[in-house]
Regions:
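PRPP/pyrophosphate-binding module of the type I phosphoribosyltransferase fold
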Residues: 12-14, 262-352
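Substrate-recognition element of Asp-dependent hydrolases with the DxDx(T/V) motif
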Residues: 13, 22-52, 58-65, 212
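Active-site-facing substrate-recognition patch
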Residues: 135-210, 219-221, 253-285
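Metal-dependent phosphoesterase signature
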Residues: 1-20
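A short, structured active-site edge motif that brings together acidic residues
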Residues: 54-69, 212-216, 244-257
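Conserved Lys-Pro-Asp/Glu-containing loop-to-beta segment of HAD-superfamily phosphomonoesterases
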Residues: 71-93, 292-295
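PRPP-dependent phosphoribosyltransferase catalytic core
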Residues: 126-165, 307-378
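Acidic, Mg2+-coordinating phosphoryl-transfer loop and its flanking beta/alpha structural elements
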Residues: 88-125
Length: 378
C-alpha cells in the first residue's frame, strides 16, 4: 500500500485558493482507500474543509515536519517502509520532509522551486499525478529477480520471457527507449518502482553509492544513452550525493562491439569483445575508489555486461557492484569471474585479462512483480 503526502503549498493555485484539478486527483486517490494527507507546520487552512469535503483526505499538523520524523513515525506505527510514502514536492520544506523521511519525492511540475525542479520524478499535472500513483501502486515493492555472486549482485524488475515467445532483447530495449523518451506518467512510474525497490533493499537511503550505465555497443553514442537520463533521474530520487556528472559517462566505449542481442559476436559468454572495446572514464579514477556502484542496463540474458563491468570496477578499487536490469530473459544468467591485468581506465588488450570461470548465477524471484512492468513498458 502506498501513501501520498502533500502540503498546502503543493496544491495552491493562488495564495488562498487550491487548484481544483489537484484537489480532485487527491480526493480520487484517497477515496480508493489509499492514505492521502495534507501535512503542514501550520494550522489547517481555511479552505481545507470545503475543498476536501466528503473525501478521505486528512489534514495533519506536524510541527518541524522538515526533519522527516513524521514520516518515520507513521511508517513505524503502521509497519510499512518509508519508501511506500510518495511526497509531492513544491517547496524546500516538502523536499526536506521527504528526503529526511526517506520517502519517494515526486516534484510538482507546476512549482518553480529549485529543489523540486532538480528531482528525477516530476508530474506535470493532476492527471499525471494520478497515473503515476496508480501505476506505482500496482507494484508489489520488490525486484522480480535478486541474485548475488561472490563478486557482484544482479537485480531485475521483470521476467521478459513473460512478454511472449516473440520477445527478444532488441524489441524490449526499443520499448524501454520509447517509454523513457515519451516521458510522462509511465516513465515516472518506472522511476518510482525502481527507486522503491532500491530503497526497500537498502532499508532507506544509502551513502557512498555511485551510479553508472553500461554503454551501448556503438561508440558514437557517447553518453547519448536513453538510460543515461533514466539513471540520472534515478540517482536524484534515491541519493542526495552526486559522484558522477551527467555529461561524463562512467564507461567509455572506444571501439564498436558486436551487438550481442542481435546474434552478433558468437559465444555470448565470451567477454573478449566487451573487455577490449571499453574502459572506465579516467575522470573518475579517484572518486570511484571505495564506492558501492550501481550499473543500469535495459535487459540481460547471460549477464555478461555485469560481469565485465564488475571486473573493471574491482580493478579500479570500487567496494562493490550491483547490476540492475529492467528486465531479464530466461534462466541463463551467469556469474563471470574476470581479472584485469592492466589499467582499467585505458583500453585493455585480449592478453591483459583472464576469464577465470563462469558459472550459473542463481537467485530468488517474486512472481507478482512482472505483470506491473507490462503496464509501464507495453
Amino acid at each position: 500500500m502506498l501513501a501520498l503526502l502533500a502540503s498546502p503549498s503543493s496544491i495552491l493555485k493562488t495564495a488562498t485558493k487550491p487548484d481544483t484539478d489537484i484537489v480532485e486527483a487527491l480526493k480520487d486517490i484517497a477515496n480508493k482507500n489509499n492514505p492521502v494527507a495534507i501535512v503542514s507546520n501550520n494550522p489547517k487552512p481555511n479552505w481545507f474543509d470545503e475543498a476536501f469535503n466528503l473525501s478521505k483526505v486528512v489534514f495533519v499538523r506536524a510541527k518541524g515536519r522538515q526533519s522527516g520524523q513524521f514520516i518515520k513515525d507513521v511508517a513505524k506505527k503502521h509497519n510499512m517502509p518509508t519508501s511506500n510514502f510518495l511526497c509531492l514536492t513544491a517547496t524546500d520544506e516538502d523536499y526536506m520532509m521527504g528526503k529526511n523521511g526517506q520517502a519517494i519525492l515526486i516534484a510538482a511540475g507546476w512549482s518553480n522551486n529549485a529543489k523540486a525542479k532538480s528531482l528525477g520524478i516530476q508530474v506535470a499535472n493532476a492527471s499525471e499525478l494520478k497515473e503515476v500513483f496508480e501505476l506505482t501502486n500496482n507494484w508489489p515493492g520488490s525486484w522480480w529477480f535478486t541474485g548475488n555472486s561472490p563478486s557482484y549482485g544482479v537485480r531485475a524488475l521483470a521476467d521478459l520471457s513473460s512478454y511472449g515467445a516473440g520477445a527478444d532483447q532488441v524489441s524490449f530495449s526499443q520499448k524501454v527507449t520509447n517509454t523513457v523518451k515519451q516521458g510522462g506518467g509511465r516513465l515516472n512510474a518506472l522511476l518510482t518502482i525502481t527507486s522503491r525497490s532500491l530503497l526497500l533493499e537498502w532499508g532507506g537511503e544509502k551513502k557512498g553509492v555511485f551510479f553508472g550505465v553500461y554503454p551501448s555497443s556503438d561508440p558514437t553514442k557517447f553518453n547519448d544513452e536513453v538510460l543515461t537520463d533514466f539513471t540520472h533521474r534515478l540517482r536524484t530520487t534515491v541519493s542526495r550525493v552526486r559522484y558522477a556528472d551527467r555529461s561524463e559517462p562512467l564507461f567509455i566505449r572506444h571501439t564498436a562491439s558486436p551487438k550481442r542481442s542481435k546474434g552478433q559476436g558468437g559465444d555470448r559468454t565470451d567477454p573478449t569483445s566487451q573487455v577490449t572495446t571499453l574502459h572506465l572514464n579516467p575522470s573518475y579514477a579517484q572518486s570511484i575508489r571505495g564506492k558501492d556502484v550501481i550499473i543500469i542496463d535495459d535487459c540481460t540474458t547471460y549477464g555478461l555486461s555485469f560481469g565485465v563491468a564488475a571486473a573493471f570496477l574491482a580493478a579500479a578499487g570500487a567496494s562493490s557492484m550491483t547490476g540492475i536490469a529492467l528486465g531479464k530473459f530466461g534462466s541463463r544468467l551467469e556469474h563471470y569471474h574476470i581479472t584485469l591485468n592492466s589499467d582499467p581506465f585505458a583500453p585493455v588488450k585480449a592478453s591483459d585479462f583472464t576469464l577465470v570461470e563462469h558459472t550459473s548465477l542463481p537467485g530468488k524471484t517474486a512472481v507478482g512483480a512482472q505483470n506491473a512492468l507490462h503496464e509501464l513498458v507495453p
